[in-house]
C-alpha cells in the first residue's frame, strides 16, 4: 500500500516521548449528549499535542441508519475515490453516499476528500461471518487501493480525525452538531512516526476504536501475530495493532474486556509465580498462547465499541490515566483536570491500577448488574 507522500508532515524535530492526551466520556444509560463536551475536555489538554494529529470517535450518531455499516473514508484524489467505490459497489449495496460535513477552518491544511457511505453487504461467503467480511473489506482497501483509507467501518458510529489540534479538528468536522452516548478523543504528539491524516487517532475496525498515549515497542511482534489472523497493518503507526487486537480477542474469540486486558497488559512472571494455583495456570496459559499480543512499552489506552468503554494502562503504569463517575457517566482521561472541566463535582475519582482495566458497559447490554468495573490505584 502506498500513500501520497506530500501530505506527510515530518515530526522528528518535535519528539517528546511522553505526550499525547486521551479522553473518553460514556453515558451508561445510552443517553446521547453533544460532542461539544468532549471537545471542551480535550481543549484543556492542548499542550499535550503539537498540532500533528487529533480526532474523535462517536457512538449513537446515526440512529436513523443504525443497522447499516457506515464507512468514513479518506481519499487523496477523485481517481482514488472512483477506484474504491468500484470495489465497494461490487460487494455492498450503497444505501447512502455523501461528503462528510465540514466547515472551513484556517488552521486545517491539506484537506483530503472525506466521504461516508451507509452500506449493506450483498453476499457473505459461507465460511465467513458478516463482521469478518467487513474486516476483509477494510483490509483490502487500506492495503490494495492507493490513496484510499477507511477511517471507521462500524454501525451507528464514526471516526473524525486529521492533522491539527483537537479544537480545530472538532470545528472542521462540526463535532458540536453530533450527539452520541460514547465519545473518545485524542490529541497527538507523534514520536516515532509521521503526522498524517490516516495516522491520527482514533484507530478503528468495525465499531471498535482505540485512542492511545504512549509507545508500543512490541509493534513488530504484535504485527506478525495479527497477520496470522488476516489483519494487515498499513497505517504507519503502532496504535493500529491495538485496534486489531481488541477486535480479535473480544469479538472473534469472545473474551471479556477483563481477560483481554490481562493479555494485552499481562502480569509479570514474578507476579504470576505468586498467584494461587488455578489463577497461576490461567495466566501462564495466556502468556504462553498469546505472548505475541503482549503490548510492551508505556501506554494508556481507551477502547470503545457500541456497548462499552474501557481504559487500560501498561503493567507498570508509565503513562497517566484517571477515571471518574458521576451518576450515569463514566469519564476516563489523561488528566483529572480534563474530567473536572466538564464534570466539576464527580461522585468518585481514582487512578486505575497498572494493568487493571476500567470498564463501563451500557445498562441495556450488560449481562449482570455490573455496569462499571475498575480498582482504585
UniProtKB/Swiss-Prot annotation:
Disulfide bonds: none annotated. It comes from the Bacteria. The active site is at residue 20. Keywords: Glutamine amidotransferase. InterPro entries: GATase_2_dom, Glu_synth_lsu_1, Ntn_hydrolases_N. CDD domains: GlxB. Residues 20-377 form the Glutamine amidotransferase type-2 domain. This is Uncharacterized protein TM_0398.
